[in-house]
From Swiss-Prot:
GO CC aspect terms: cytosol; extracellular exosome; extracellular region; focal adhesion; lamellipodium; neuron projection; perinuclear region of cytoplasm; postsynapse
Effect seen on changing residue 704 to D: Constitutive induction of the formation of actin filaments
Organism: Homo sapiens
Record gene name: CYFIP1
Pfam family, one: FragX_IP
Keywords of the record: Actin-binding, Cell projection, Cell shape, Cytoplasm, Developmental protein, Differentiation, Neurogenesis, Phosphoprotein, Synapse, Synaptosome
Protein name according to UniProt: Cytoplasmic FMR1-interacting protein 1
Modified positions (Phosphothreonine) in chain numbering: 1234
Length: 1253
């Protein structure tokens, strides 16, 4: 029975589940991260050779030689790395200026201390190349011995010798290139001689030898050639090596790019070594020993190959520098100048895309069944053919990857050898450095895109193949095992039978050695009763051999032994006069050749993950030690603008090419390759540190540019979506097209949550979110800043900018976790903790300093326009902040379009502006502004206006009766003109006094119009909220139908939308309270008919507390009739003044002050309750009545009567309208029902003649 698990343990186990990483749905647009799994290395370097006692002894001995040569090659690689990554130490050490310098001993001691370990390495390098040359020449001498010349030499052996030739070529070029090595040695030698470090003659001699070795160019090549030329027949062996390389290259018997380039270098350097004083390659060609025309063709196709790091070699150089080139110059085409089509990557792209598409489609079929559906777990159910298909697929994939990687490196190599100049590229400045001309200015836009695309294909396919690694590994081991066992147990059975039968002992021993080396018998041993072993035929019933199936590959030694022994059977050379090949039958030879060719790739495929990585390695695109050496210490490192990974990344960002945007992370991955290579192959921490420093800088730049682009893209998108469609079509008709932004693929990049770079996992989404949030905030800041630097009319543009930002926020929020737009807006508006924000403050500021004193209201258009004659000083505003288009409407074209739209709102303040003010200020902001406006009105009414009223009351006539009709209108006009002479001639009346009244009137009108706009907003709210509050419209009822039944049906239909019961059922107490309050507020806001304007008028009435407004109590106890002591008589006098028509070049009171002046006067009259007296006793109205009756027109004291009466008529209509509106608002609060008339009884009036009696 299972052990009991306690509840506590069970809960802790469940908690642990949270720590399990769950794969997210992030789109894969980056290469695979560095594997944390081990890459097993099954290459034993023939350490297990002695175990194969059944093998042919000679090949076991050869394996021993191979083993030591491989070790030497590894050591050579280490010296190549040492030379390539050598940075000058002597430049960093302070130099001794003169012999009298006091601290020179100390400097020399430090120099020796620092440089001694480095010079020791150089000394070891000199010894190594001596030993290597001796070893190589020893092998050549052994193989060229007269007795051994007919012997068979295996391909593996020849290729190893070829690798030696390649090593010598690389080491010599590196030694030639590195001046810093010689300089460091010289500095050390100087210091050591001064300190007498090298006393014994031997060390002096060795030091001298090292100096000569380092100073002499091509020293290694010369030594090698000298020692080879004394060996008789050395050119025959070299010809074999070169021919093998030609054969391998022709039949594509290579897998990694480095193997391909090595074959070419061995051909070139091999020919150079063969063409000397002893031998002549052209004679060998004539004897058909080598094929120079074929080599020439390959060298023409691929003129430049990578040598080491960023060092390249032109293959034709080996030919040009050979001994007999001059007299045979005409035979070579590769030495002529001119580019090979191989380097035109743009033309190659069609083929590469086709290959990529074809292979990806094929791979996807297997990938979907193996990885996605998980059927790959049932390994045992697959047939040999299915495994073979997977095996072929793996090989084909590796070959494609290798081909593309080689292609990229070859184009890069060609460009490094052929830098551009100002004639080839007009963008290239004269002052450009060598490396800059080779990288930054050396690629066209198309070439950069082609490189990016190929790199993306390489890295993308690497991901897909990496995912199937386990599937491929199993299939490869299974297929290799099956092929090896079928071949050894079944295919070789017939030739073995023939050899035994015909007593061909050598072939028999080789075949049996092969079978003993690799056969894995079903029963554990070779069947004893096999007729073939006796040279007999199989029985008629057949002899069944069951070959087992396992997923186990052969060891590296096993594979080498089998291939070498098979090769010996079909080789053209063998120790005796007659070759073994001639003793074999035709089909057998074909079988052996086929297996030998196929098994060439087994070693690579068995080490699948390592080979995959080598085929995709583009690390050399970053290394630049050769070009740094050329700067002679002027440069410690090159800037990122010259670095290939950044050049490609930046090109995508700068061009904003949509089809390339998803590839941007692949070009950044080149840094991963280089860093991995610096640590694992070069073993140099300082190179890794330099790569890391560049990555830090580049990634910052990348995020900065990408975030800016993304923000700008979505801002343009928002601006385009919100742009008036009619304007767009109108512009199109006029021939100016406002383009919609082309679609781009930022979504995939925005979904990247864990980008792998130098072993770090980076949340790209979060980094972009931070930058976009900052840009969003800056946009809002800028919109408000622009508003603060302009007048009140620009509030419509502010609203438009905020809407575009809101839309941008909405579009971006699909992919980024941004703060809420309202929270961002409040922060930009400085309205988080403060009760009112920047917009509210600026609205009031503008109202106070510009709107009230400088705008004229026109009741007909319901708009304010700027006055023609300003009375206040011009208002100074802040300078408008500068801004890039993406922080405004998105682009220059959109900025122009929107500017033209908002331009039509610039010359007035009207309903559109008030609606925006209501939306942006909200209840709180409006309350603040109105409170402040009331303070302004109070200060005016109790300040300057009161002073003018007092002053003007003093110059008013004490009594001014309304003359009788008999006097006629001209007489009455003359009478009033005379009576009001002091008022008419009062200088400040038409300026300061009217200006102050206009300010009060504008303030009143602002409050009224704001309330009207607010009502519209509230009605809109109410209608939007109605379906959620169970407020349903009455339905149409036909005759005979009942209304309540229909309404019930409607209510039940909309019940799920009714919010309050829903929240009462499902919500928390806090949510229920909020829902109820919201419901109540929405319902009651308009229903109870609250009026803000009435409250404002009531407040203003309280400001009119001075007795001068109402005058003393009437002597008759009822009202003043003829006395001029109440405000309405003063206003009548003012009205008389502004009704007088003006001259031709003068401004009317309407132009200067607008309707605000009349609103102020009428409001004061209404608030004082004098409106009816004003209507009855006004001077102008009296004149209008009389003139209407008699219809006269005269010019009295320069005043045309008819024109004046015309003006009076207009103002009477305006006054009546204003007074009616004010009356309506003031009476809105009176009790409902019939109005109560207040009646007072007075004594009937007595005529004056009777009164005295």
């Amino acid at each position: 029975m299972a052990a009991q698990v306690t509840l506590e343990d069970a809960l802790s186990n469940v908690d642990l589940l949270e720590e399990l990483p769950l794969p997210d749905q992030q789109p894969c647009i980056e290469p695979p991260p560095s594997s944390l799994l081990y890459q097993p290395n099954f290459n034993t370097n023939f350490e297990d050779r002695n175990a194969f006692v059944t093998g042919i002894a000679r090949y076991i001995e050869q394996a021993t030689v191979h083993s030591s040569m491989n070790e030497m090659l590894e050591e050579g690689q280490e010296y190549a790395v040492m030379l390539y990554t050598w940075r000058s130490c002597s430049r960093a050490i302070p130099q001794v200026k003169c012999n009298e310098q006091p601290n020179r001993v100390e400097i020399y001691e430090k120099t020796v201390e620092v440089l001694e370990p480095e010079v020791t390495k150089l000394m070891n390098f000199m010894y190594f190349q001596r030993n290597a040359i001796e070893r190589f020449c020893g092998e050549v001498r052994r193989l060229c011995h007269a007795e051994r010349r007919k012997d068979f030499v295996s391909e593996a052996y020849l290729i190893t010798l070829g690798k030696f030739i390649n090593m010598f070529a690389v080491l010599d070029e590196l030694k030639n290139m590195k001046c810093s090595v010689k300089n460091d040695h010289s500095a050390y030698k100087r210091a050591a001689q001064f300190l007498r470090k090298m006393a014994d003659p031997q060390s002096i001699q060795e030091s001298q030898n090292l100096s000569m070795f380092l100073a002499n160019h091509n020293k290694i090549t010369q030594s090698l050639q000298q020692q080879l030329e004394v060996i008789s027949g050395y050119e025959e062996l070299l010809a074999d090596i070169v021919n093998l390389c030609v054969d391998y290259y022709e039949n594509r018997m290579y897998l990694t790019p480095s193997e391909k380039h090595m074959l070419l270098k061995v051909m070139g350097f091999g020919l150079y070594l063969m063409d000397g004083s002893v031998s002549n390659i052209y004679k060998l060609d004539a004897k058909k020993r080598i094929n120079l025309s074929k080599i020439d063709k390959y060298f023409k196709q691929l003129q430049v190959v990578p040598l080491f790091g960023d060092m390249q070699i032109e293959l034709a150089r080996y030919i040009k520098t050979s001994a007999h080139y001059e007299e045979n110059k005409s035979r070579w085409t590769c030495t002529s100048s001119g580019s090979s089509p191989q380097y035109n990557i743009c033309e190659q792209m069609i083929q590469i895309r086709e290959d990529h598409m074809r292979f990806i489609s094929e791979l996807a079929r297997y990938s979907n069944s193996e990885v996605v559906t998980g059927s790959g777990r049932q390994e045992a159910q697959k047939t040999d053919a299915e495994y073979r298909k997977l095996f072929d697929l793996a090989l084909q994939g590796l070959q494609l990857l290798s081909q593309w990687s080689a292609h990229v490196m070859e184009v890069y190599s060609w460009k490094l050898v052929h830098p551009t100049d100002k004639y080839s590229n007009k963008d290239c400045p004269d002052s450009a450095e060598e490396y800059e001309r080779a990288t930054r200015y050396n690629y066209t836009s198309e070439e950069k895109f082609a490189l990016v695309e190929v790199i993306a294909m390489i890295k993308g396919l690497q991901v897909l193949m990496g995912r199937m690694e386990s599937v491929f590994n199993h299939a490869i081991r299974h297929t290799v095992y099956a092929a090896l066992q079928d071949f050894s147990q079944v295919t070789l059975r017939e030739p073995l039978r023939q050899a035994i039968k015909k007593k061909k002992n050598v072939i028999q021993s080789v075949l049996q050695a092969i079978r003993k080396t690799v056969c894995d018998w079903e029963t554990g041993h070779e069947p004893f009763n096999d007729p073939a072993l006796r040279g007999e035929k199989d029985p008629k019933s057949g002899f069944d051999i069951k070959v087992p199936r396992r997923a186990v590959g052969p060891s590296s030694t096993q594979l080498y032994m089998v291939r070498t022994m098979l090769e010996s059977l079909i080789a053209d050379k063998s120790g005796s006069k007659k070759t073994l090949r001639s003793s074999l039958e035709g089909p057998t030879i074909l079988d052996i050749e086929k297996f030998h060719r196929e098994s060439f790739f087994y070693t690579h495929l068995i080490n699948f993950s390592e080979t995959l990585q080598q085929c995709c390695d583009l690390s050399q695109l970053w290394f630049r030690e050769f070009f740094l050496e050329l700067t002679m210490g002027r440069r410690i490192q090159f800037p990122i603008e010259m670095s290939m990974p950044w050049i490609l990344t930046d090109h995508i960002l700068e061009t904003k090419e949509a089809s390339m945007m998803e590839y941007v992370l692949y070009s950044l991955d080149l840094y991963n390759d280089s860093a991995h290579y610096a640590l694992t192959r070069f073993n140099k921490q300082f190179l890794y540190d330099e790569i890391e420093a560049e990555v830090n800088l580049c990634f910052d730049q990348f995020v900065y540019k990408l975030a800016d682009q993304i923000f700008a893209y979505y801002k343009v998108m928002a601006g385009s979506l919100l742009l008036d469609k009619r304007l767009r079509s109108e512009c199109k008709n006029q021939g100016a097209t406002i383009h919609l932004p082309p679609s781009n693929r930022y979504e995939t990049l925005l979904k990247q949550r864990h980008v792998q770079l130098l072993g770090r996992s980076i949340d790209l989404n979060r980094l972009i979110t931070q930058r976009v949030s900052a840009a969003m905030y800056k946009s809002l800041e800028l919109a408000i800043g622009r508003f603060e630097s302009e007048d009140l009319t620009s509030i419509v543009e502010l609203d438009g900018l905020l809407e575009i930002n809101r839309m941008t926020h909405k579009l971006l929020s699909r992919y980024l976790t941004l703060d809420g737009f309202d929270a961002m807006f409040r922060e930009a508006n400085h309205n988080v903790s403060a009760p009112y924000g920047r917009i509210t403050l600026h609205v009031f500021w503008e109202l106070n300093y510009d709107f009230l004193p400088n705008y004229c209201y026109n009741g007909s258009t319901n708009r304010f326009v700027r006055t023609v004659l300003p009375f206040s000083q011009e208002f100074q505003r802040d300078k408008q902040p500068n801004a890039q288009p993406q922080y405004l409407h998105g682009s220059k074209a959109l900025n122009l379009a929107y500017s033209s739209i908002y331009g039509s709102y610039r010359n007035f303040v009207g309903p559109p502006h008030f609606q925006v003010i209501c939306r942006l200020l909200g209840y709180q902001g409006i309350a603040v502004v109105m409170e402040e406006l009331l303070k302004v009105v109070k200060s005016l009414l109790q300040g300057t206006i009161l002073q003018y009223v007092k002053t003007l009351m003093e110059v008013m006539p004490k009594i001014c009766r309304l003359p009788r009709h008999e006097y006629g209108s001209p007489g009455i006009l003359e009478f009033f003109h005379h009576q009001l002479k002091d008022i008419v001639e009062y200088a400040e009346l038409k300026t300061v006094c009217f200006q102050n009244l206009r300010e009060v009137g504008n303030a009143i009108l602002f409050c009224l119009l704001i309330e009207q706009s607010l009502s519209l907003e509230e009605v809109c709210d109410l209608l939007h909220a109605a379906p959620f509050q169970n407020i349903l419209p009455r339905v149409h009822v036909k005759e005979g139908e009942r209304l309540d039944a229909k309404m019930k049906r409607l209510e039940s239909k909309y019940a799920p939308l009714h919010l309050v019961p829903l929240i009462e059922r499902l919500g928390t107490p806090q949510q229920i309270a909020i829902a109820r309050e919201g419901d109540l507020l929405t319902k009651e806001r308009l229903c109870c008919g609250l009026s803000m304007f009435e409250v404002i008028l009531t407040r203003i009435r309280s400001f009119l507390d001075d007795p001068i407004w109402r005058g003393p109590l009437p002597s008759n106890g009822v009202m003043h009739v003829d006395e001029c002591v109440e405000f309405h008589r003063l206003w009548s006098a003012m009205q008389f003044v502004y009704c007088i028509p003006v001259g031709t070049h003068e401004f009317t009171v309407e132009q200067c002050f607008g309707d605000g002046l009349h609103w102020a006067g009428c409001m004061i009259i209404v608030l004082l309750g004098q409106q009816r007296r004003f209507a009855v006793l006004d001077f102008c109205y009296h004149l209008l009545k009389v003139q209407k009756h008699d219809g006269k027109d005269e010019i009295i004291k320069n005043v045309p009567l008819k024109k004046m009466v015309e003006r009076i008529r207009k103002f009477q209509i305006l006054n009546d309208e204003i007074i009616t509106i004010l009356d309506k608002y003031l009476k809105s609060g009176d009790g409902e029902g019939t109005p109560v008339e207040h009646v007072r009884c007075f004594q009937p009036p007595i005529h004056q003649s009777l009164a005295s009696s």
